[in-house]
Regions:
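Conserved short alpha-helical segments that host acidic/polar catalytic motifs at enzyme active sites
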Residues: 1-200
């Protein structure tokens, strides 16, 4: 990649494919996934100074325990603030981690605009965490499509609208084929009408 790094959002994801005990045994690190995610975010730190967030999705949570943990910050030094909130990382000991550094081109400078965004559900197959870099030109059309379909969107922000669009198709697919969601089909349907630049 020869392009100069500019001020843009950064997205990082870690997916551990083996049991968590394997990484502790091999590397001697209790929370290997979180340490890798932090390293990826620190390496991209120049890309986002307006906000930061980290989420850990537990693929097999015990009943009665949350399926994910998330911290976000819009403090003066957001990544350092997020890492302080994470502390020893015990709650973030997980197989799937998602991080984001925000460079605000639109929207407010506030924690509600910081990714990862979450679409809540008590059904694990319908829960969605999203982080990305969005500059969509079809926000108005997406917003109007939501209104016409009986939804009540709480924001015009492109990230929010995209989260709700993906969640709509995910819910529909999960209802049609419970436990056997075709995620590539869900994303294809949700992203098809988009125009602009984005990274998920």
């Amino acid at each position: 990649m020869s392009d100069a790094l500019k001020h843009e959002c950064a997205v990082a994801m870690v997916r551990l494919r083996k049991d968590l005990s394997y990484y502790k045994s091999k590397y001697g690190i209790e929370n290997y996934g979180l340490s890798r995610l932090i390293l990826l975010l620190e390496k991209q730190h120049n890309r986002g100074q307006d906000g930061a967030g980290i989420a850990a999705l537990h693929l097999h949570p015990e009943p009665g325990r949350p399926a994910y943990q998330r911290v976000r910050s819009a403090a003066d030094n957001p990544l350092a603030d997020v890492l302080q909130q994470v502390g020893d990382g015990a709650e973030f000991h997980s197989e799937l981690l998602l991080g984001h550094l925000r460079y605000a081109t639109f929207g407010r400078y506030d924690v509600s605009c910081c990714y990862p965004f979450v679409h809540e559900s008590t059904q694990l197959g319908r829960m969605l965490l999203l982080a990305g870099n969005f500059n969509l030109t079809t926000n108005t059309e997406m917003y109007e499509r939501f209104l016409e379909s009986g939804h009540h969107p709480a924001s015009h922000a492109d990230g929010y609208l995209l989260l709700q669009t993906i969640a709509h198709y995910l819910d529909r697919e999960e209802s049609r084929t419970p436990g056997m969601v075709n995620l590539s089909g869900v994303l294809r349907a949700a992203l098809q009408p988009l125009d602009g630049a984005f990274t998920l």
